[in-house]
Amino acid sequence: MQEQYRPDMIEPKVQQYWAENKVFKAIKDESKEKYYCLSMFPYPSGRLHMGHVRNYTIGDVISRYQRMLGKNVLQPFGWDAFGLPAEGAAIKNKTAPAKWTYENIAYMKKQLQLLGFGFDWDREIATCKPDYYKWEQWFFTELYKKGLVYKKTSTVNWCPNDETVLANEQVHEGCCWRCDTPVEQKEIPQWFIKITDYAEQLLGGLDTLPQWPDMVKTMQRNWIGRSEGVEITFDVANTNEKVAVYTTRPDTFYGVSYLGIAAAHPLASLAAQNNSELAAFIQEAKNAKVAEADLATMEKKGMATGLFAIHPLTGEKLPIWVANFVLMHYGTGAVMAVPAHDQRDFEFAQKYGLQIKQVIEPIADEEIDLTKQAFTEHGKLVNSAEFDGKDFDGAFNGIADKLEKLGVGKRQVNYRLRDWGVSRQRYWGAPIPMLTLENGDVVPAPMEDLPIILPEDVVMDGVKSPIKADLNWAKTTLNGAPALKETDTFDTFMESSWYYARYTCPQYQNGMLDAEEANYWLPVDQYIGGIEHATMHLLYFRFFHKLLRDAGFVTSDEPADKLLCQGMVLADAFYYTSPTNERIWVSPTQVTLERDEKGRIIKATDPEGRELVHSGMTKMSKSKNNGIDPQEMVEKYGADTVRLFMMFASPAEMTLEWQESGVEGAKRFLGRVWNLVYQYQQNPAKTSLDLTALSAEQKVLRREVHKTIAKVSDDIGRRQTFNTAIAAVMELMNKLTKASLDSEQDRAVMAEALSAVVRMLYPITPHICFELWQALGNESAIDTAEWVKADEAAMVEDEKLIVVQVNGKVRGKVTVAADADEDTVKTIAFADENVKKFIDNQHIVKVIYVVGKLLNVVVKP
């Protein structure tokens, strides 16, 4: 081996070996335990970012470790290739989304290969390819036949000037991104999948996932939002209309003072027929497009409809108001308002002078002031007829029973979860496989017509989807009769909901999945991705697995046994303010820094000498120009160094602060490992280790080696605290660099230690370890080596080093047998020449012994 560590020479050679020998190709083998490790696949945006590198490094470390344990490891890779950004980029670069996407995939694949990830590239998937989305289209038609798919009108962002639907990202401050026309809310027919049919299974399944982060499970539970309540029907006075509400607080029913309805509720339209002021308010509320997350903070607005609901128990007339905080797609689109016991209802009632009736009082003697805020806790009932004095449970059941007997109420379990709207009025997505016949009937496309291929050679004008603009594209026939293809495309979450399963059989042509392959590899053993996917992708991923199970493709209930959510990668961000008061962000790579003695930044300047504001460590992003290019870092330091820093700088689930000084430190450490192997290689051991001929120092060094092996095995395998595993190897390296290589047994102990160090580092820094493994005289490649095992006997200490203090000050250290009792330790300690100086002619007051560690002798003259 050469004397200097040169990653630029080592890494390409090792990567070529892996590629030529298909080292990471996974083949089903029933005789071996399988391990399926999967990192969430990326959107091919053009360049890898450090968030990608962190995700895939974690996955690669786990995969390589599991392979060394003897498991049959599958680590595939692919591309979540459909999506809106491709359309914007195509318009900007005057190209087609497909061309832009495929170029990005090719470039990013080269970047990934530079980092040495052990992917099985034979299983590569790009979701924009017809051989992938064909089966998604087919599955959708099967779900339709099962009654799990339906079409209904739903609200979209509509630009009246361009006559086109806009994604949320294309609406800037309420206006169209392209022509600046105010955006309207428009109802159009869209396709939905009945995820609500699986709400209870999705909720219950969370209890079977002990190795998923609690935070993800809590977020999913809240998103599914199971509640038990009562649906109550009110008659509308002087009409034949009825209005239904759902409440989880029937105990407050006698305190209802008004009903709130959504702007899109049929009663609102009825009331607005002869009321132009109300009609204008309704239109304004519809166009405002309120997200559920904004409900708590937005200004509450409303207008009376002039209609009244009849309270089914008291006969009281309750005014019906259109309220901007009631959403048509949530619940029934109407709410019963109890201002005394709901803060939102209280604020609305105060604003519009509506009645506030107390029907709950605190159980304890607590002072409440209903002129200032609502009392929202459970309590006992007042002003509630025969239910006065009852607690929450008694009142819930009593009032629910009464409403059910009267035929105006029914107990109901509701979910916050809504059905999954999968229609997108965009071009770059998989076409929805439904056909409209001349008589208006809508039917699924037959299998022989699939895939319905998205044309790739298109011109983007930035207004209409090419398949909507080209009227001929939609024209087709079914059984010889004219029909029209659906011009909406699938939500891209469709593709990412089943890709993990297709990886088990990506070339399979006879169906969506090869059940034999799928059931060998699935469920995924380890899934890795950001927590930002908790309530979208990770919920659809679980839902789709249950759909695949019910279709007979898989036998497991959940798609992944274990989930790791890696933290974000942060970097310093710097800016200056332009003459127009705009923040201009400067890349950290262009910034000259001055630091104080503690390493804190005290001054930052750009290449023009401008003083910059340091806005701290923030998530790497294009908007703040603080992304660090992984490729540049690999070229500068080597892939192994980048990988090592990524795994060492922070626990995997926590944010990671990018510090180039830390990267330099990682490079220095690998240089030390290289140097130690090089020094050993100049005079290697010629005989094998003789455990019966070891000196005390050699035994201690061996003990440190095997303790490190045990810790690293536990840290990587069970705890997944990769940073502490690396720290343990670094600590061991400090001891090894000081160890003697003089005797044959010294060198034999070092040979064992270096073999262990190289194997422990291999999952993290595979290129250098590949080379060092060969330098240590191993004939086969390290890729097939077994994980190093700790020798339990070596870790047993037959001797202990005892620190001896006299009156709290260290006066000596003595070696005793590991099983020595206190009297033996005292005898040996008191015989130590240095200790004797401080206790001779002194009166021993007491002796404190901390077993196996410390002896403190308290003396006085």
Curated annotation (Swiss-Prot):
**What are the recorded GO MF terms, alphabetically?**
aminoacyl-tRNA deacylase activity; ATP binding; leucine-tRNA ligase activity
Catalytic activity as recorded in UniProt: tRNA(Leu) + L-leucine + ATP = L-leucyl-tRNA(Leu) + AMP + diphosphate
Motif 'KMSKS' region per record, residues: 619-623
Q: Keywords for this entry?
A: Aminoacyl-tRNA synthetase, ATP-binding, Cytoplasm, Ligase, Nucleotide-binding, Protein biosynthesis
The protein's enzyme class: ligase
Concerning HAMAP family, the annotation shows:
Leu_tRNA_synth_B
Keyword Cytoplasm annotated:
yes
Q: What is this protein called?
A: Leucine--tRNA ligase
Q: What is its EC number?
A: 6.1.1.4
State the Gene Ontology BP annotations.
Answer: leucyl-tRNA aminoacylation
What does the entry list under GO cellular component?
Answer: cytosol
Tell me, in one coarse class, where this protein mainly resides: cytoplasm
The subcellular localization recorded is:
Cytoplasm
The record's comment on protein family reads: Belongs to the class-I aminoacyl-tRNA synthetase family.
The answer to whether keyword Magnesium applies is: no
Per the annotation, the residue ranges of the short sequence motif 'HIGH' region are 42-52
Q: Where does ATP bind?
A: 622
Q: Highest taxon of the source?
A: Bacteria
